[in-house]
Structures are given as structure tokens and as C-alpha cells.
Amino acid sequence: MTTEDDDQMLGPSGTQEKIYVSVRMRPLNDKEKFRNDVPDWECINNTTIIYRSHLSISERSMYPSAYTFDRVFSPECCTRQVYEQGAKEVAFSVVSGVNASVFAYGQTSSGKTYTMSGITDCALVDIYGYIDKHKEREFILKFSAMEIYNESVRDLLSTDTSPLRLLDDPEKGTVVEKLTEETLRDWNHFKELLSVCKAQRQIGETALNEVSSRSHQILRLTVESIAREFSTNDKFSTLTATVNFIDLAGSERASQSLSAGTRLKEGCHINRSLLTLGTVIRKLSKEKTGHIPFRDSKLTRILQSSLGGNARTAIICTMSPARIHVEQSRNTLLFASCAKEVTTNAQVNVVMSDKALVKHLQRELAKLESELRSPSQASIVSDTTALLTEKDLEVEKLKKEVFQLAQQLEQARSEIKDLRRMVEEEKNQEKETLSTETEGLNVLMEHQYPKLRVRRTWDSENTTPLSPISAHRSSISPRSTEYSYEENVFQLSDFRIDSASSSPQQLAFVTPFLKVPLDDIHVTDTVDQSHVHKEEAIEEPHVQEERFYEMAEHTDGNSEDNCREVRCIETEKSDISIGPVENMPESSPDKYEAVTAEEPVSVTEPKNLQHPTEEAVCVTETKNLQHPTEAENEEEEEEERVKEVSGASPEPKQESNLTKNPALCDLECSPDEFDTSMSNLSRISTPPALITPSPEKPFSWIMERDSQLFRGMKLTRSRSCRPSLLSSPSSSWLEKDADTPPSWYDKEFIKTAERNLTMCDIKNQRLLQDEFSGRSMPTTWFERSLSDTQTVDAASHGVSNEMSPNESPFRPSDASVFELQTSGRASISQDRTEETAAQKDKQIIHRSMEEREQKFLASNSTKSFKDAAMDPIQDYLDTALNWPVEFKRLQREIIELWHVCKVSMAHRSYFFLLFRGDQKDCLYLEVELRRLKYIRESFAQNSNDGNNMTLISCTRALTRERYKLSKLMQRKLSKEERENLFLRWGIGLNTNHRRVQLARRLWSDYKDMGHVRESASLVGKLNGFVDMKLTSTEMFGVNYAFRPPRPKKSSLWKRSVLSLSFL
């Protein structure tokens, strides 16, 4: 343990180390030599001692023959050497602020007092030498001494021999009360105090030793060091440490020491305290978890911090080599073997004073100020090579990053190019698809509808022409409508104006081919009704074009659950009527030219109207095969005949009558014969009384709601037309949307028109649908006998909407009938000559139209029978619809209505999880949407009536469902799952009623789709239909509302579930 420099003797701080154990064997004394005693122990090297005598077989199994320690001193070693190699490093650590202790343990007369006296003197000499070398710090040495005699603590520096008490201090540990502590002035003062301690200590004579120590002596030296003011060292704090020099009394046997009386009593206390010390060392060497009896002895209590606490410890065990003390020597070596396994944790004891702290802060402040004044002086010169190497590494790193970024840039550019190419390809495909659809639609419509032309009478020359109409061709498509195909009575496919065949004052319109008696279409109306159509006819061209674009932006929807108010056609002022033009065969002699939408169309009214009646207008379109002069002559002749015919049917002013001329026959003809009949009609100058709806005002057949009478008009649907259900919740809605152009969609449509229909209940609609499914529709065209004196009753008659759900388009046997049954009375005051001429004209037109229609249907029989079994839902699915966008819109609207109508959360969750965007789910979404709208309207109607019981009951049922879900959380979710849910939903784990809070938050924010999705998943998990296979969409109509396994007995709950299930 020798060192070259005393400055290196500073012990470690805060590190664990074991007790340094060394053994010193003394030589044989005079008494042992006089008895011719021989030594049995021998030191073979500096760390090992062996038992030299031969052991018996039984002793070899009990005791080892060799012992190894940190250091072994032979009898030839002096005390200075023992100090230097066995105790100096531990004792000298006190000057660096670490506590230390040095023990001397052994049997009586083994040389403990002799060894400790020399180690104490040598340690003080070294400490004073260190103080003289380090003038930068101020050292203060304090000395105290005590002895433990017969388990009593006595102060060796005081003449008072009364025992002292031991106290426990939380910072210092066990302290001795009223112990004298002297401050050492110098070396001589220390020697004087040692002399006093030697004189005060209890000693006695025994058979083994003439001067035997009868007590345990503890000499304590406390060293405090403080940095001086002129010192520039950063060690500004105060270091405080204590070193203990412990000279234990030797263990002895009464048989050997021949003690009696007081010596025997003293020996008993010594052996008891040494036995406690051995027990503490043995337990500390094995484990520190059990109880360690430090308080069983005053010695172990005082030395508690030295044995296993905050101190460095060195034990010097002394022994005698004589054979007579072999058992005592073996016990000493066993104690030393256990002691070297004990671990201590020494730390530096730092005490910082306020004065030292202030000085340190002032010094730091001055240093920082100097650096701010001269920053250049504080620059640190670094190694140039290391700096360049670091910079090179940074450059290489940056180069790699630049290379990676360049690769990413190239990849991004290539991806952008690919995306642009894909977008261009998609646009080209869309254009090709659109052009293909448009061509196919044009071909379909051209083969489906005839060409008609509108002429006016010569009496309307002085009327003011209205604004022309410009229809954009690209806006007319099967999907260019704001409403569904079921909301339109007439499906107008195209608007084109023939500049060659029509003058600016002529009105071109093409309507679906209908088998209608011409005498049933001769309609007159009141002035008030005609005024509405006058306003409709003066729409600006750009307004019409915008409406056509709006039609293309909306998808077809099902509106079977609502009814729309429809009024009769009013044409006091001739309405603008434009429709699709059929491409006639090249071989047809009467082929007409296709009209274009860019040319203006004028609408005029008769000049010589004597009362508010409506002139019948024939809607046709012909090709100018003759000279323009001849065409004008023909037009004049036709207008004269129209004037004559219309003037012969006067009507009352306030009454709407339907005039039926018996001379006219049904308009039943083939498409080929229809052109011929139109040509013949122009030649004989007989104007047909045909009424056509306006293309931009398809819903202009609306009569005023306050009207009591109207003329009925019965129209029979041709097999080339498809039925459509026209519905609306209120008449005000219809009036607002009456200007919306009709859409094209290849669906059946029912030819219906209703009088004064303002609101239809869904239950009545359901009954109406039952009638549709159970009633067979007429299979033959309506025929009516034409009588000159027949009058029609104009009283109010209901409108019958009848169509079989399975009715297929283009089937003659299943064709539905669009009827406007009318009744009333109208007096016909016409001259017999005019009636005969009109009847002849109508009969010619009727026969021509019938023959033409038969040929047309025969040519299209293949397509009609092919489409007879077409599924209307499949047609709806096959349309070019942006379904994902439409699905999200329907889903959000349904979720919002769920919230408004207080729908059961189980139903919401089941519906939300079942329908996830499949295009075939459109029907179920439409049904659910209409159901919810009806519930909302029912709630509103009940609220207006002062009855809110339905909404209140639904709210109560929803509250009970939330309470039930909170109960299901306790049953079906584990504690860990519930805590995770609470944290995910922002509910504190330390709050009350957490499950109720979570249940109240479910389906509370209907605008957040993430919240809706989480709510549906949780409700589904609690109700048990998330993990199981969901009911198929085909069965959802039956299982419309999910019912939990154990429904509550409450009748309110049952009523709410049933109302949600079957409404």
C-alpha cells in the first residue's frame, strides 16, 4: 500500500469497496520461549498464512490449513511497515473528506495496543505533513477519546468517570453525549492528549499479560479543511471527515488468564462485546437484508457507520504463533476471513458555507464579465487536424444527403409525369365514353320519336315574338336532370330547331309518340292560367342553358314515397316546345331535316281572341321540299283552317272545358305513316288540335290550387314511352321547381296528372303501391266514340296513378295508361259545315298516326322485347354515376337525420357497419333516407299540433339505451379495455360515472365521421353484432332495426323499436 506521493492518498468518493484486512503475526515472547513453545503458523508470502503442524483427519474437514488476506505481516515486520501497507491509505483519506476507521482485533497478549499506538502516531505525522504542503486550504483538527468499560462509555479526556449516553443524529449517526472534543494546536498538543488517554484507560494484570487492556479504546480525529481567500483553486467548499483509531480489548479464556473477581467480570463484558462484533461482521459478509444487531453492544452501535456505512475501514488482526494459543489464533483468522467480505460505501462529506458560496459566485461573475469585455481573449485554440477531419466528415454527410435528395427529386418527377399521363388518358377515355353515349342516345332517340312541326294561324301576325332559346347539346343527356326519372311526366331527350323548315315565328317541338285522340287534346283555359305560361315562355336563353347544366350535376333518385302536385297544360300563349328529332330513313319521301338548337324560336298567340281561350296548336315538323313561296302558301291555308276550327268551339270564361270533336279519330299510326299524314294534313289545310308541353317548362301543366273545376284530358301512353312517378311533398315545392327541365333516364314512368294535390301521406302511397302490384293495367289503347253532341263534364275527378312494379317498358300488354279523366259540360256551338271539315281532318290524322306507329313498333320489336325484363334497379346501378361521392352525401344526410329523429343507436350502428359503400346498397340508403324524412315531418306536424309525445318518447328510449350500454360495458368489457376506452374518449380515470359519461358521448357529434365510426364500432361490440357475420343486405328490410338479445320489458322501448322498424 505504499505510494510515491502523499497527494495521491486521497480516497475515492461515492464508490463501494470492501474492508481492507491484514494479519500481523508477532514473534514468540519470553514466557513462550521459556516454556519451549514452538510456532505452528507460518507466513509463506505477503498474502497467505498456513498452519504448519499436521492436522488430524477430523480437523482437516473442519478447518482449512491456509488463509489468504489482503496483506500478511510476518514477525519480522515493524509497525511502520504495517502502517504504510495496511492502514495508511485508509487513514489518510480523512484529509480529502472521507470518513475512515482502523481496527486492531486479536486475543489478549497478541500486540493490539502496541500496533495501534504506532499506527496512530504515524497517521498523525502524515496528516501534519500533508497540511504543511497544502497552504491553500485551512485545516482544523479536533481530537476526542473514549473507552467502553463493562458496557459503559467513558470520556478519556475528562476526569469525570460517569458514563455517557449514546444519541442518534439523523446526519451524523450515533453520537456520544457530552464527549470532550479538543482542537489540536500542534504535534506536541496531540502527544499530551495521548498521554492523558493512556493514563485514564483501564488496564490490569493477568496470567497471560502483565499490562492487559480491560476496555475498548476509541480515539477520534476530526479534520476540517477550508479554502483560503487568496487561493485560486475551485475547491471553495468545506470538507469534514473523521478517522477512528480503535484498540479493542483481547478475548481471553478464564482458564488461561486465571482471572477472578473483577478481572473475570471485565473478561465477560469484553467477550460479549467481541461476540456481538463477530455476529455483525458475519451477517454483513453474507447479506444485508436481514436484521443486523448493531444495538446489542455499545461497541457495534458506535462503530455502525464504520462497519457498513459511509466510511473506509481497515482491520489489522494480530495473532500469536504459539501452539498453546492455536485455537484463539484460528478464531481470529476466521473473523478476518468474514471481515474481508464486508462492503462499505464511502462518500466525500462536503459542507458549503454561505460565505464560501458568495465568494464562488462573485468569482464566476467577474470571470463572465471579463469574457464579455474581451471575447477574443477567451478563444480556445483547437487542434487543426481534428477540426479538418470533422469538417470533412460533415462534407461527406452533406454529399450523401444531396445525392439522396436528387434521387428523390427524379423519382418525384417521374411520378408526376406518370400521373399527368394517367389523367390525360382518363380524360380521353371520358371524352370517348361521353361521345359514345351521346351517339348511342341520339341513335336511340332518333329511332324512337317522330318529327313534328308547329305552325301558327295567320291571325297571330301582330303578336310580339319572344326571346329565342339556345339549347346546348352537350347538356342533354340521360342524366342531365336535377330530379330523378320518376319525377317527370314527359321525358324530352333533345332540343333542336330546324332553320330550313321553320321560320323565326314557328315553334318546333318533338314529343314522345303517343296514341292520343286528337279531339281529346283540344284544350282551352282561363286567362289567369294562360298568364302563367306567358311568363314561362319569356325565359332568357342563358337561364335555360344554366338549368340544363344544373340538370347534369345531379343524380337520379327514387321518390316513390312523395307526391307532386301537377296542373293542367295552359297554352293561351303558345309555349316554346323543343324535343328530340328522329332520324328518318333515307328512303322516306317525307324525310325532314334535323333541326339545330342555335336558331331562335318564336312563340306567338292568335290575334283575334275574343275571350280567354286557348287555341289548339298542331306540333309538327316537316322538311321544306317545295319552294319557299309554296310553303308560305300552304302555311296560310293551314292557319286559316285552324282559325276556322278553333273559332267554332267557344268556352265560358271562368271554366276549363275539354272540347272533343267526334269527327277526329285516335292518333294511331306508324312512324313512316306519320310523316305522310302530316304532309297530307298540310295539303288539305286542316290544323290538328294537338297540345304539347313546353320543353323548358315541362311542369307547366299546373293549375291553380284554388280552382274548383278543370277540364280532364285522357292521354294513352304509347309503347315507345316509359312511365314515371311524379311526386312531391307539397305544392309550394312544386311551384318552386316547376321551371326545372325534365331529365332523360331509361326508366318506366307513369303517365299521371293530378288536380289540386298538395300533400300525399306515405301510408297512402304504400296503399297505392299495393294497388300497383295487384291490379292489371289495360292492355289495349283507349278508344272513344266520336260524337258531335258529346259533352264532357268538367267537374273535379281524381287522378289515378296505377302501374305495376314489374311493368316493363315497351311492352304493349303491360303499358300503363296516363289518364286525365275529366267531366263537365261544354256547349258546342259550331256550324255543321265547320264540324264536318274538322272531323274529316282528324280522321285522316288518326289513321295516318296509327299506321305509322304500328310500323315503328314492328321495327323496334326486338329491342322492346329485349328490354321487357330489364331490372330498373340494375339500370340505376349501371348508370355512369360517381357513386363514392353520392354514397358519402347520402350517408351524411342519413346520419344527420338519425340525430334529429333520435333513432336508436343500435339501429344506427348496425346500418352504418352493414352498408359501407357498395353500389348495390343505393336502394337501402334511399329507403332509409325517405323513412327518416317522413319521421322528421311527422315530428314537425305533431309539434305544430301541440303534441310532442312521439319525439319525447324517442328521446326517453334513447336515454334508456345509453344507460343500458353503460351496464353492458361492465359486463362485456374487461377493466383494462374500459380504461383504454375512457382514455381514448377523453374521460379521466379518477372521475365518477365514467361509463355513463362514455355512453352519453356515443353518437353525440354526427358531423365528425371519425366519431361516428368509433361510436358504431363500440355500440356494435357491446350489442354483439360486430364480431358475428352481419345480416345480408337482402334481409335488412326484414331486420330493419337491430334488437338486442334481452329486450327490456318496457312497452315504451318496444313501441320505439317497432316504430323505427316499420315506419
Swiss-Prot record:
Annotated stretches, region: Disordered: 574-664
Query: What GO biological process term is on the record, naming one?
Result: microtubule-based movement
Return one GO MF term. Answer: microtubule motor activity
Q: Does the keyword Repressor apply?
A: no
InterPro entries from the UniProt entry? Kinesin-like_fam (IPR027640), Kinesin_motor_CS (IPR019821), Kinesin_motor_dom (IPR001752), Kinesin_motor_dom_sf (IPR036961), NACK_C (IPR021881), P-loop_NTPase (IPR027417)
Q: Which residues form the signal peptide?
A: none
Respond yes or no to whether keyword Nucleotide-binding is given for this record.
Answer: yes
Q: Name one Pfam family in it.
A: DUF3490
Coiled coil start-end = 351-436
Q: Which residues form the Kinesin motor domain?
A: 18-342
Q: Which UniProt keywords apply?
A: ATP-binding, Coiled coil, Microtubule, Motor protein, Nucleotide-binding
Cellular component GO terms, alphabetical: microtubule; plasmodesma
Q: Which residues does the annotation say bind ATP?
A: 106-113
Per the record, the domain of life is Eukaryota
Q: Record's family?
A: Belongs to the TRAFAC class myosin-kinesin ATPase superfamily. Kinesin family. KIN-7 subfamily.
In Swiss-Prot or TrEMBL terms, this protein is called Kinesin-like protein KIN-7H
**Which organism was this protein described from?**
Arabidopsis thaliana (Mouse-ear cress)
Q: Report the gene name.
A: KIN7H
